[in-house]
Amino acid sequence: MSKRTYEVVANLGRRVPSPSAAGGGTPALPNCRGFANTSCFPVRKGAFSFLLACAILPVVAEVPFCALRFGYRFTQPDKWPEMRAALEKNRPAFDEVWFSTGVSFPSLAWHEEHARQCAKAADDLRKMGIVPSIEIQTIIGHTDGIIGAGDCSGQDWGTMVSADGLPAKHLSCPRDPKLIAYFVRVAEMHAAWKPGSVWVDDDLSYRNRAPVLKPGNRLAGCFCDACIAGFSRAEGKTWERAALAQAIRSDAAMRTRWDDYSCGVMGELTRAIAAAVHRVSPETVMGYQYGGPLYAAIPRGLYDGSGHPVRLRPGGGSYWDTDPNDQLNKAYYLQNLLDGFRGEKWIGACCPEIETCPRTFACRTAQGLILEAFENLALGMDFLSMFAADARTDETTDFYADDLFPRLATAHAFLQGYHAANDGTRPCGFSVTNERPAKLVACRGVPIVGATRRSLGALPDIASIGVRMAGSGEVDVHSPLYQTRVMQIASSTGLTNFYARCDRAAGGKMPVVFESAVRAFAMPRVRADWTLATVAIVNASIDRQEPVTVRLRGVPAEAKTAVWHQPEAEDVVIALVREGANVRVRLPRIGAWACGYLSFR
């Protein structure tokens, strides 16, 4: 990499911090230049504060609304007829399908045959009106173990090396010319069948590349001789591995330069892949799947190579239905991963990672997928992607054809209708200071917003509920987890009083106020003039939510009635009771872990 390229990349290396230890996940990398560390949210210079209202983001209509991701086996001759039949049988479920190149490094001859199989499957999808796309599921590699379980006969390039000199067996050095040439050729092969989009997966990241990042090491980046030599040229100083590692650990400025250099190397790799796709299929859009911090150089390389705004799919965790609250928590986290990048000319539509692991019936249900999709749309995502099928297990295709896909097909119109009703709107609620808001706060009827929002200000101190434990005095509200503890044991009276406190803090403009305590996620969406467009509700409990009265603000003056929409039920018309600026609505009974939304007409 030239000194000039390094300097350019240095301006692209900003990233969103990972969750804190309290919120779960890997601690944030330091030196997040250009960020407002008080809240772990990035704020661009010259931009409005994240607590201020900003321009309305339109729904991106040209993007297929719901994509299905699946493993490479489903496009092979013995599996594709079954999957094609399942998709035909449940045509409304999906608008796009992402094929896969697999998770190892087979020969280019294998990829050539696989591209031919994908081309045939793509023709079948187009006849159904489904957009065919593909993800390059492995470039650097997820882990040595995952890569090594497959065919690695095509790997003839160097591997990553840790800061203490430990070489990986399969994890790839991102600057190796042979690696770049291999994936440029793979990209060209698949671009020949004109995919709607080509995605690079979250293995192409700057963290969690085991065993390079091992306990006691934890320095990201490749410390092979070639990468150290490239950094030395950029620095104008010769570095040895041990001295460089020590300098990175002890010098924050050095750490920043190393981060920027390493991310820039990956950006050059993505630029080469995107340019290869663009040469063969100029209309194909590039996408980037990632978990944790977003290093701008990587998707920026996709933009520079293709000329198209890059679609983003942040992700990370909650792959089971064992704790639906965590899926809501994840939805907030994903929004925060996008904060600071929305509105950039090189960023296009964004979707959430909705994923099951290992894609069988014991992990996720159709209802769980629908709820997670609904929550992410409520918080501001543009479209949906679901990794919901895999042929690596012994799961038979009839499970998808007869169980999972039919429910998703039924819910598609509900989800798309909700998305359309939110065109030109933003979520509206309170801002919080921690990156992942306590899930029980959002699930007690208090609207909390993530990145793309209209803020009512800071969330009032939950300790004001004043909870006491029977026989043990007051709750320790100074604990790092006090929000969860207090909200978990709050009485109905204490919670109802907290609603009133929140409304006072918002100057009496809180768009949705429950008249009595609920266990529910509520997310109002408002237009530029603060009029109310929709109110999303999820019953966040294992029991039904009995009918409850909701006080609304900002209901359009011309609205005569409200309509209650649910995924698998008829719409219900509800009377509006106007009392000055307030409008009262009586919500019907909501089933356990069920969702719906109000619109107005």
Which sequence ranges carry the predicted segments?
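Active-site-adjacent "subsite" loops/lids of carbohydrate-active enzymes
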Residues: 134-193, 206, 236-259, 263
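Substrate-binding cleft/loops of secretory-pathway carbohydrate-active enzymes
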Residues: 208, 257, 261-333, 360-377
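Catalytic domains of carbohydrate-active enzymes, especially glycoside hydrolases
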Residues: 75-105, 192-197, 372-383, 446
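The substrate-binding groove and active-site-proximal loops of carbohydrate-active enzymes
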Residues: 66-77, 100-114, 165-182, 250-268, ...
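Aromatic-lined substrate-binding rim segments of carbohydrate-active enzymes
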Residues: 84-87, 101-153
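Carbohydrate-binding surfaces of carbohydrate-active enzymes
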Residues: 279, 283, 292, 324-601
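Aromatic-lined carbohydrate-recognition surfaces of secreted/lumenal glycan-active proteins
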Residues: 63-75, 133-139, 199-203, 256-299, ...
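Active-site neighborhood of glycoside hydrolase catalytic domains
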Residues: 182, 192-197, 201, 206-207, ...
